[in-house]
């Protein structure tokens, strides 16, 4: 069981550290509001991580093979990512004032993180691969206890990363110039728009 738990920790860190939509939104909000909004985005994303993990481990991910499920979910994902991308470009053009905008950033940061994570069906592809990896670790079909240990290890690593990522973004906010903030906002906006385009391309 220890080997399963440690493997899940490593896979979880690999999943969370890779840049993507959640990190981009964490950076955008954290540069304005600091640690709390950045942390809330990360914590919100745990909802989606947990849902996709359970779907992947239980085999319910097969539902995404149906066009009636996959297409609306992908369209919603693309639309939301595009909207966030436009917000990022807007912030690059006219950076928000931290004192005025921090409260607004904090209020909906948790929901933004959850929405990004829940609306991204590509997460289940990763979990399909992890399911195969888990089967290799246990040398067969994992039982319920083994799956739960793997899930717990993954979620623990995700929770640890939430605080590490938020602290990093807050440090960047305090120790970098406004020019760097604007470049970061623009980069996040372009990345989010690119991810929206990739989502549509997969239809």
Swiss-Prot record:
Gene Ontology annotations of biological process type: amino acid transport
Keyword hit for Membrane: yes
Any GO CC annotation of this UniProt entry: plasma membrane
First-listed, main subcellular location of the protein, grouped into a coarse class: membrane
Disulfide bonds listed in the record: none
Keyword Glycoprotein recorded: no
Cited InterPro entries: LeuE-type
Membrane topology: Multi-pass membrane protein
Alphabetically ordered keywords of this record: Cell membrane, Membrane, Transmembrane, Transmembrane helix
GO molecular function: amino acid transmembrane transporter activity
Family: Belongs to the Rht family.
Protein name per its UniProtKB record: Chemotactic transduction protein ChpE
């Amino acid at each position: 069981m220890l080997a399963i738990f440690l493997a899940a920790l490593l896979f979880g860190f690999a999943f969370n550290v890779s840049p993507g939509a959640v990190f981009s939104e964490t950076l955008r909000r954290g540069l304005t509001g600091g640690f709390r909004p950045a942390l809330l985005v990360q914590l919100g994303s745990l909802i989606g991580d947990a849902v996709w993990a359970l779907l992947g481990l239980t085999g319910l991910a097969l539902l995404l093979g149906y066009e009636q499920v996959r297409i609306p979910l992908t369209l919603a994902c693309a639309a939301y990512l595009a909207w966030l991308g436009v917000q990022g470009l807007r912030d690059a053009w006219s950076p928000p004032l931290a004192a005025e905008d921090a409260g607004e950033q904090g209020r909906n940061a948790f929901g933004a993180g959850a929405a990004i994570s829940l609306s991204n069906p590509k997460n289940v592809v990763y979990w399909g691969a992890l399911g195969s990896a888990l089967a290799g670790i246990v040398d067969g079909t994992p039982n319920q206890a083994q799956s739960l240990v793997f899930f717990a290890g993954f979620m623990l690593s995700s929770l640890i990363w939430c605080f590490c990522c938020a602290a990093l973004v807050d440090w960047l906010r305090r120790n970098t110039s406004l020019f760097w903030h604007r470049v970061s906002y623009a980069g996040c906006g372009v990345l989010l728009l690119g991810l929206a385009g990739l989502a549509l391309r997969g239809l």
